[in-house]
Each structure stands twice: as structure tokens, then as C-alpha cells.
Amino acid sequence: MPAEMQAPQWLLLLLVILPATGSDPVLCFTQYEESSGRCKGLLGRDIRVEDCCLNAAYAFQEHDGGLCQACRSPQWSAWSLWGPCSVTCSEGSQLRHRRCVGRGGQCSENVAPGTLEWQLQACEDQPCCPEMGGWSEWGPWGPCSVTCSKGTQIRQRVCDNPAPKCGGHCPGEAQQSQACDTQKTCPTHGAWASWGPWSPCSGSCLGGAQEPKETRSRSCSAPAPSHQPPGKPCSGPAYEHKACSGLPPCPVAGGWGPWSPLSPCSVTCGLGQTLEQRTCDHPAPRHGGPFCAGDATRNQMCNKAVPCPVNGEWEAWGKWSDCSRLRMSINCEGTPGQQSRSRSCGGRKFNGKPCAGKLQDIRHCYNIHNCIMKGSWSQWSTWSLCTPPCSPNATRVRQRLCTPLLPKYPPTVSMVEGQGEKNVTFWGTPRPLCEALQGQKLVVEEKRSCLHVPVCKDPEEKKP
């Protein structure tokens, strides 16, 4: 199908090219997390970018809290989740983005590392907007909340005059309260005063005939229960006992032993770490004494000064060659031919593994390029993304296309005896003929404005 007959599927905008990283010291990390774009596993500070990126799997930051940058060749990150809809009801728009991440090159379409790319689409969280309701008249006052002294009573109203719609509500309170007086005196119930101080321990060590303990008491006087009308006495014990603490044997704090020799470097290329260990046994803690303060291990950075291998990766397949057959014209004839495409293995360095798989791909085909065929109008396509994505005047389109009715050629062919049936595909752009629709013969297009377009903001920018 010609490019001018297709509805746009992705609408892109490139923004914010980050400053190039020089040779100033950076923070070096052992992992670049693709899903979040964050650096993981801090290896060391004040490292040169060239040393950190001896391993293409590492990543770096120019300063604490800065943008994490991968050492590998530039690639597009995964698309972020769609942002919130610009309105909470009716139709609006939402954005998502991705970033060109890496160093030493460019992403597809000659895009520099650090560049943001945006997409905008229409959205609708809720098909209707809330409508406020109205209150009914207040109901009668309810009974007093207490049977003696003063309390409160309430009355209520209902949000149904009219009832709210589509998630709306009535402004104000559904309930009112006011003071009420029963004209009756309430009894005073007893309450405990605060506990007194603990008495001295009844013993000086553990293991005697009786368990050493401390005792404290309290009185029912805060307040005391009334006599007329009678109040309830305090519930619970007036005395409390507990076992004495801090008696011998005394605790012994732990102490560190000497550091072990350095372990070998953890890697054979690039930057790694060595490890030292020590044990809390000079002396070991006893009788509840505290464990040794500090770390039982410590790391030091080591540099093998050897680049790490980088395995090759297949580049995208090239275009299919023309569908042809040796010494025979097969255009519009229904005779099968062959076509091929190839790809290259790039990025392999420092004795990395070559790409696995085929360098060339061959398939069987029918050549229908520029063949005149009967056509039919397709259904409306889905709405495209909004373009431009960061403009308040963004629009979206959908299309109906004159699509060819492909001939019913055999779907498989046996070109070489003993090799079985092979699938055959159609190749080329035919010339479909349809009855005119809205004055058009090939494409009918409908355009619509995108509503409530949000502002494009770099998600890495710090909020004030």
C-alpha cells in the first residue's frame, strides 16, 4: 500500500537534548534499569566516563540526582505509561514519552542521546460531568444523646431535591447537632489516680529463695465515686508487681577481630570490587551485651583496565528485493517467483559473540506491482494519535481506503521436489479500482480536533 494512503499511526515530537558528557568525574554504576531509566548498583565516585564505560552494560550520573546515562550504544527506551487524562469528565487528551539513551552515537532517525519523544492521544475517563443535587427540608430533632446532665441531639436531611447525577453531590452537611439538657444529675464513677513510684527491689541478685520484685500502688480518688446518686467503684487491682531488672550477670559487649586479606577482583574486565571481612569474636558478646558496631565487610574498587566484550546485535532487515523469476516475466501473471532480504550484524567489539541466525531471508511471492485490480472500500480506521502532540490545536484523523481484492492464487507452491510445500505471499502495490466515495477514488479522510490538550513537560525536571 503506498505511504500516502496510510493513516498516521505514531505522532512524534523530539524535545530537550541533554548536554554532552565530558571527561569530568562521574558516579559509576553496574546496571542501567531499562524499565525506570535509573542507575543501580553504585560502583564508585569520581570515576572517568571512559573508565566506567569500559563495560557497555554499566551506566553513570554526572552528579547525585542527575539523569542516569547508559554506557551502551544509543537506543530508544520503552514508552512510558500514558499520563492522566487532561480532564476528569467528557473528552480530553493524554501524553506519553520515551528517551534516546546511550553514548557514542545516535538513535534511529539521527536523534541525539537525551532527546525526549512525545505521543498524544484522545482519552475519556468518564462520559459525563457531575451535576450537583439539592437538599430536602430538615427532619425533626432526635432524642438527647444522654439520660442525665447535658448532651446533644441531631436532625438530618436527604440529598434528593433533586438527586445528584454522574458522581455529583449536595454542598453542605447532611446532619446538624445542638445542645440538650435532661435536667438530671449524673452519678460520679470512680477513677484511678496515677501509679505511685516503684519501691526498691526486694533482692540484690537472681537465683534466691524468692523472685526479687518491685511494687507500686494507686488510689481510687481521681475522682472518688459519688454517694448520691451512687457511682461505680474503680475496677482493677490497687497494687502492681514486676520482676527486678539489671541484676548480675553483667552483659559483655562484642569486639571486632582483624580484617581478612583482600579477595581477588570480582571481574576480569572493566571495574570491579575486592572484599575484606572481619568477625565479632574479640570478644564475642555475652549475657545480652551489644553486638559489634560497624560493618563486617568492606569493599574496595579494582580496575582491570581491559575493555569487556560486546556481543554483536542484528540490525533491522533490509527491504525485500523485487519479486522475479529467472528469464520469465511474472508481473500480474499468477506465476510464483522469489525475493530476498538481508541484514547485518553490528556493534561487536572486544571479541564479543557474533550474531546468531541467518544473514539472508528468502521467500516465494506473486508479483502484483502496479496490477489493475477490482477494489472495495474498507471500514473506517481507528482514530490516529493527535498531532502535533504539544499543541493546543492538535487534530486526529481516520480514513477509509480503496483496498484491492487480491486474486485467488494458490497459497503454497512446491518449487523443488522433496522439499515440501512453501507459503507464497503477494508483493508489490496494486492499483485498485473502486466506485467514487464522497468524490474520492482512493482515500476518504475525516479530521477532528483534540480537546483539552495538556502541556508537555520533561518528567526529569525537578518540581519547585
From Swiss-Prot:
SMART domains: TSP1. PROSITE patterns: TSP1 (PS50092). Disulfide bonds join C28-C52, C39-C68, C53-C71, C85-C123, C89-C129, C100-C107, C128-C166, C144-C180, C148-C186, C159-C170, C201-C244, C205-C250, C220-C234, C265-C302, C269-C308, C280-C292, C323-C365, C332-C371, C345-C355, C386-C450, C390-C456, C402-C434. Residues 346-354 are annotated as: Interaction with Complement C3 beta chain. Gene3D superfamilies: Thrombospondin type-1 (TSP1) repeat. Glycans are attached at residues 79, 82, 135, 138, 141, 147, 192, 195, 198, 204, 256, 259, 268, 317, 320, 377, 380, 383, 423. GO terms for cellular component: cytoplasmic side of Golgi membrane; extracellular space; secretory granule. Residues 24-72, 73-130, 132-187, 189-251, 253-309, 311-372, 374-457 form the TSP type-1 domain. One of its GO terms (biological process) is complement activation. It is found in: Secreted. InterPro entries: CFP_TSR-0 (IPR049536), CFP_TSR_C (IPR054019), Compl_asym_regulator (IPR052065), TSP1_rpt (IPR000884), TSP1_rpt_sf (IPR036383). Residues 1-22 form the signal peptide. Keywords: Complement alternate pathway, Disulfide bond, Glycoprotein, Immunity, Innate immunity, Repeat, Secreted, Signal. TSP type-1 domain 0 binds to TSP type-1 domain 4, and TSP type-1 domain 1 binds to TSP type-1 domain 6. These interactions mediate multimerization. In plasma, properdin exists as dimers, trimers or tetramers in the relative proportions of 26:54:20. Interacts with the pro-C3-convertase enzyme complex (C3b-Bb) comprised of Complement C3 beta chain (C3b) and the Complement factor B Bb fragment (Bb), where it binds (via its TSP type-1 5 domain) with C3b and Bb. This interaction stabilizes the complex and allows it to become the active C3-convertase enzyme complex (C3b-Bb-FP). Interacts with C3b. Interacts with CFB. A positive regulator of the alternate pathway of complement. It binds to and stabilizes the C3- and C5-convertase enzyme complexes. Inhibits CFI-CFH mediated degradation of Inhibits CFI-CFH mediated degradation of Complement C3 beta chain (C3b). This is Properdin. It comes from Mus musculus (Mouse). The lineage of its organism: Eukaryota, Metazoa, Chordata, Craniata, Vertebrata. The gene is Cfp.
